[in-house]
């Protein structure tokens, strides 16, 4: 499924502008090797900060992926807010993934917590507790609490939060991003099961990763 439109995130324009302008300056001076280097950097910045439109699935009892990437873990872990054991789906984003994060369900943001930390490889187990991260608690229309955690990685050094406590998010709505390779953990509430498989490539705002358990 191809997006109808592919824009650029607001965070990307300074980097794109700087590298693009530098390429033009070096080209005007006849310094072609440097111009080529900055042209490549400009292209990479445009690719990294791309923000394609996505068609979000409709239907009751569905949760869509909060991030582009590969599912590297589906396991029970302690929720960052309640401490209770809940099923967690971990999605690893490499530097070539779209890094805009989207809400898995419609709901209201109840809590946001930032944790300073290290920058080890986001694919490692200890990244969930040791790395810099930002956790969000979201209550859906049925009163169920969802938790999403943005985890900075080995290269990623900035987590971007675009929402506040009390904000109402739609399913698939953008709520933030992480720069240059990272991970998002999605904690499911009771009554939901994983609808994606380990190793599966998923796309934020588009792929269903969990659904309500059939009674």
Swiss-Prot record:
Main location group: membrane
Pathway(s) the chain acts in: Phospholipid metabolism; phosphatidylethanolamine biosynthesis; phosphatidylethanolamine from CDP-diacylglycerol: step 2/2
Membrane topology of the entry: Peripheral membrane protein
GO molecular function: phosphatidylserine decarboxylase activity
GO biological process: phosphatidylethanolamine biosynthetic process
A cellular-component GO term for this protein: plasma membrane
Entry EC no(s): 4.1.1.65
Residues the record marks as site: Cleavage (non-hydrolytic): 181-182
Disulfide bridges in this chain: none
Modified residues (Pyruvic acid (Ser)): 182
Regions annotated as coiled coil: none
Name of this chain's protein: Phosphatidylserine decarboxylase proenzyme
Cofactor, how bound (note): Binds 1 pyruvoyl group covalently per subunit.
InterPro entries to which the protein is assigned, alphabetical: PS_Dcarbxylase, PSD-A
Subcellular localization: Cell membrane
Keywords: Cell membrane, Decarboxylase, Lipid biosynthesis, Lipid metabolism, Lyase, Membrane, Phospholipid biosynthesis, Phospholipid metabolism, Pyruvate, Zymogen
Role summary: Catalyzes the formation of phosphatidylethanolamine (PtdEtn) from phosphatidylserine (PtdSer).
Catalytic activity: a 1,2-diacyl-sn-glycero-3-phospho-L-serine + H(+) = a 1,2-diacyl-sn-glycero-3-phosphoethanolamine + CO2
Species for this entry: Desulfovibrio desulfuricans (strain ATCC 27774 / DSM 6949 / MB)
């Amino acid at each position: 499924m191809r997006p109808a439109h592919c824009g650029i995130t607001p965070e990307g324009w300074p980097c794109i502008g700087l590298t693009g302008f530098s390429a033009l300056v070096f080209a005007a001076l006849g310094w072609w090797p440097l111009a080529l280097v900055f042209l490549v950097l400009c292209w990479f910045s445009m690719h990294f900060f791309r923000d394609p439109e996505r068609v979000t699935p409709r239907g009751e009892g569905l949760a869509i992926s909060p991030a582009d990437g590969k599912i590297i873990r589906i396991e029970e872990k302690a929720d960052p807010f309640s401490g209770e054991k809940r099923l967690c789906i971990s999605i690893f984003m490499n530097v070539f993934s779209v890094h805009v994060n989207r809400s898995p369900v419609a709901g209201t943001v109840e809590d946001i917590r930032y944790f300073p930390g290290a920058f080890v490889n986001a694919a490692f187990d200890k990244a969930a507790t040791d790395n810099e991260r930002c956790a969000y608690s979201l209550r859906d229309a049925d009163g169920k609490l969802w938790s999403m955690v943005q985890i900075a990685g080995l290269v990623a050094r900035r987590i971007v939060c675009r929402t506040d406590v009390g904000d109402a998010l739609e399913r698939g709505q953008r709520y933030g991003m992480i720069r240059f390779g990272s991970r998002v953990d999605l904690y499911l509430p009771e009554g939901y099961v994983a609808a994606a498989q380990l190793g599966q490539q998923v796309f934020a705002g588009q792929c269903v990763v969990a659904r309500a358990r059939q009674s």
